[in-house]
Design a protein with these regions (language model features):
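Flexible glycine/proline-enriched surface loops and loop-helix/loop-strand junctions
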Residues: 126-128, 182-187, 194, 243-252, ...
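Short helix-loop capping/hinge segments that flank enzyme active sites or metal/cofactor-binding pockets
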Residues: 106-126, 295-299, 350-418, 472-482
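Acidic-enriched catalytic cores of C-N bond-cleaving enzymes acting on peptides and small amides
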Residues: 260-282, 305-338, 349-381
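Glycine-rich, small-residue loops and helix-cap segments
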Residues: 53, 107, 396-516
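A short helix-breaking turn/cap at a secondary-structure junction
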Residues: 232-317, 324, 508-516
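Gly/Ser-rich catalytic/binding loops embedded in alpha/beta enzyme cores
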Residues: 38-216, 234, 295, 319, ...
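N-terminal signal peptide c-region/cleavage motif recognized by signal peptidases
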Residues: 32-34
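Sec-dependent signal peptide recognition
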Residues: 20-26
Length: 516
C-alpha cells in the first residue's frame, strides 16, 4: 500500500514536473515573442539576439506572423503570409547551429510589395483581381538577392492597385485584392501610396525590412506619413526584372526600415547588374560607410506648398540643424519646369501601355487577362469589386496612346529628364551646398474613397524623373502624425547623400521628437 502511494506520488510529481517544464518552455517562447515582435527592430538588434541565443529565426518569424495576424485586420497592410516562411527560418537556424552565417541579412524577415514576384504558391497581383492567379514561380532579381543574403521572405504587402496608375480619383492604399490600407498612426487617415502596406508594416513592426516600388513618390510618401526610413535608389542601381511594370523610365525598387543604416544595408544587397534589366550597372556601394564631414552647408527648399503646420515643423528642423553646427541656406529652383509634369505624364502613359501589355502577354495560362484593353474590359465586367469606389480613366488614357509615335516619345523623354537633372544639378552648383533638403510631404490626410487623395506638397518628382537618389527620414510629428524630411541627391552622388542623411538624422535624434 505504501509502495503504491509512493509510486502514485512519484508519478504525480513527474506529471507536475513535465507540466512545469512545458509552461517554462511556453513562457520562454512568450518572452521570445515579445522580444522579437515588440522590442527587436533593427538588423543589428536581431543579429545580436541570434548570436546570444536569446531567440531563434523560427521564433522570430513566428512572432512576426502572430503580430500580423493580430493587428493586420485593423490596417490591411499585409495581403499574404509566405507559406514557407517558417521553413526558411528553420534552415537559417540549422546554419546558425553549425556556426555558419548565411549573409548580411542572415535570418532577417522581409515583406515585399505585392507587385514583386516570388517562387512558390503566392500570386503577384499588383492589387488587381485580374492577377489573382498570377503565380509566376519566379523570384524577381531583388528577391534572389535577398535570399542569397540570408533573408526570410515573410509575405506580400498591400498597395495602391496598379501602383496608383488606374484612376485620377483613387484612394492611395486601396486595391481590390487587399482593400483599403490604413495609416499606422490613425486608421481614419491615408497611408499614401503606392507602397502603402510596406510602410505601414514597418511602422507597426510587422517586419524589420520591407521593399516598396516607386515611379514618383510611391516609396518616399508612404514612408514619410508612416514615420519610417526609406530610400528611392538611383536609376540603374537596382533591377526591376520580375516586378509588375509601370514605367521603365522611372520605376525603382527600394527598402523601408527602422533605421537609415538598415535601409542602406538592404540597398547594398539589392543592387547589382542584371542581364534582364539593361538599365542596371555594377554599383560600388558599401553597406558600411564613414562620415567624413561633420559640418554641412545645407540647401533648404521652400515649404510654402505644404500645410502650415508642416512649415512650422520644417522651421524647427532647420533650427535643429543650425544648433548642430550646420549652415542652412534658403534655396529655390530657378529652372523653368512648365513642361515637366505634362511630359512626365505622357512618358508614363506611353511606357505603361507598352510594358503592361508585354507583361500581361507573358503571364501563365491561369491569367486570362492578356492585354491592357482586356484589363479595362475585365474591370467593367467586375465593376462591383474593381470599381467600387473609383474608375479607370488613366488605364483608358494609356490604352489610347499611339505607340508608333516613337520620335515624339523619345524627344519628350529626353526633354523632361534633361530638365529635371539640370534643376537638381543647378540647386547644388548655383548655391554651393553639400546637400539639398525639403519636407517629403505633409501629414496624412483623411482617407476619402469618394473624392480620392488630398495631397498637400511633395518633393519626389525631380528625383523620380532625373533618376537620382531620394532618401526620406522620420523628422517629427504634426498633431501626432509623422512627417518626413527628404534628402535630394545630386546626379551620380548617392554616396554623399547617404553620408549627409546620416549626419542630418543624428542631428534630429536629440532635438526633434521622432515618431515612436
Amino acid at each position: 500500500m505504501w509502495g503504491f502511494f509512493v509510486l502514485k506520488v512519484t508519478k504525480q510529481l513527474f506529471v507536475y514536473f513535465f507540466m512545469i517544464k512545458k509552461l517554462l518552455g511556453l513562457l520562454t517562447w512568450i518572452v521570445a515573442f515579445n522580444t522579437s515582435a515588440l522590442e527587436l527592430k533593427t538588423i543589428d538588434e536581431i543579429h545580436s539576439a541570434y548570436k546570444n541565443n536569446t531567440i531563434t529565426a523560427q521564433q522570430l518569424a513566428q512572432g512576426y506572423i502572430k503580430r500580423i495576424n493580430q493587428l493586420n485586420p485593423q490596417f490591411n497592410a499585409v495581403i499574404n503570409i509566405e507559406p514557407t516562411a517558417i521553413t526558411q527560418a528553420k534552415k537559417i537556424d540549422e546554419l546558425s547551429a553549425q556556426g555558419l552565417w548565411a549573409g548580411p541579412l542572415h535570418g532577417i524577415p522581409v515583406l515585399l510589395k505585392d507587385n514583386i514576384e516570388t517562387t512558390g504558391s503566392l500570386p503577384t497581383t499588383a492589387g488587381s483581381l485580374a492577377l489573382k492567379n498570377n503565380i509566376t514561380n519566379n523570384d524577381a532579381f531583388v528577391v534572389k538577392q535577398l535570399r542569397n543574403a540570408g533573408a526570410i521572405i515573410l509575405g506580400k504587402t498591400n498597395l495602391s492597385e496598379w501602383a496608383n496608375f488606374r484612376s485620377s480619383y483613387s484612394s492611395s492604399g486601396w486595391s481590390a485584392v487587399g482593400g483599403q490600407t490604413h495609416n499606422a498612426y490613425d486608421t481614419t487617415r491615408n497611408p499614401c501610396g503606392s507602397s502603402s502596406g510596406s510602410a505601414v508594416a514597418i511602422a507597426l513592426n510587422f517586419a524589420p525590412v520591407a521593399l516598396g516600388t516607386e515611379t514618383d513618390g510611391s516609396i518616399t510618401c508612404p514612408a514619410s506619413v508612416n514615420g519610417v526610413y526609406a530610400i528611392k535608389p538611383s536609376m540603374g542601381q537596382v533591377s526591376r526584372s520580375g516586378v509588375v511594370p509601370l514605367s521603365s523610365s522611372q520605376d525603382s525598387v527600394g527598402p523601408m526600415a527602422h533605421s537609415l543604416k538598415d535601409a542602406r544595408l538592404v540597398l547594398s544587397v539589392l543592387q547589382g547588374r542584371d542581364p534582364l534589366d539593361t538599365s542596371t550597372h555594377s554599383f560600388e556601394l558599401q553597406a558600411q560607410y564613414k562620415v567624413t564631414k561633420s559640418s554641412l552647408v545645407i540647401g533648404a527648399l521652400p515649404s510654402d506648398k505644404f500645410t502650415v503646420e508642416t512649415q512650422r515643423l520644417y522651421k524647427k528642423q532647420l533650427s535643429a540643424l543650425k544648433q548642430a553646427g550646420h549652415t542652412v541656406v534658403n534655396i529655390d529652383i530657378s529652372d523653368d519646369l512648365a513642361t515637366l509634369f505634362v511630359d512626365e505624364y505622357y512618358v508614363l502613359l506611353y511606357d505603361f501601355n507598352k510594358e503592361i501589355n508585354q507583361y500581361l502577354a507573358n503571364t501563365s495560362d491561369q491569367v486570362k487577362v492578356k492585354s491592357l484593353s482586356a484589363l479595362i474590359d475585365f474591370n467593367k465586367q467586375n465593376k462591383a469589386a474593381e470599381m467600387l469606389h473609383f474608375g479607370q480613366d488613366i488605364l483608358i488614357q494609356a490604352n489610347a496612346v499611339d505607340l508608333t509615335q516613337t520620335d515624339k516619345y523619345q524627344k519628350t523623354k529626353h526633354r523632361y529628364r534633361t530638365l529635371a537633372t539640370a534643376a537638381i544639378t543647378n540647386l547644388y552648383k548655383n548655391n554651393n551646398v553639400d546637400v539639398v533638403i525639403a519636407p517629403t510631404t505633409s501629414p496624412a490626410w483623411k482617407t476619402d474613397l469618394v473624392n480620392g487623395d488630398n495631397f498637400k506638397g511633395s518633393s519626389s518628382s525631380l528625383s523620380a524623373i532625373a533618376g537620382t537618389t531620394h532618401i526620406t527620414l522620420p523628422a517629427g510629428q504634426v498633431s501626432g502624425l509623422p512627417v518626413g524630411l527628404s534628402i535630394i541627391a545630386n546626379k551620380n552622388q548617392p554616396q554623399a547623400a547617404y553620408t549627409h542623411a546620416q549626419i542630418i538624422d543624428e542631428a534630429f535624434i536629440s532635438t526633434i521628437k521622432k515618431p515612436e
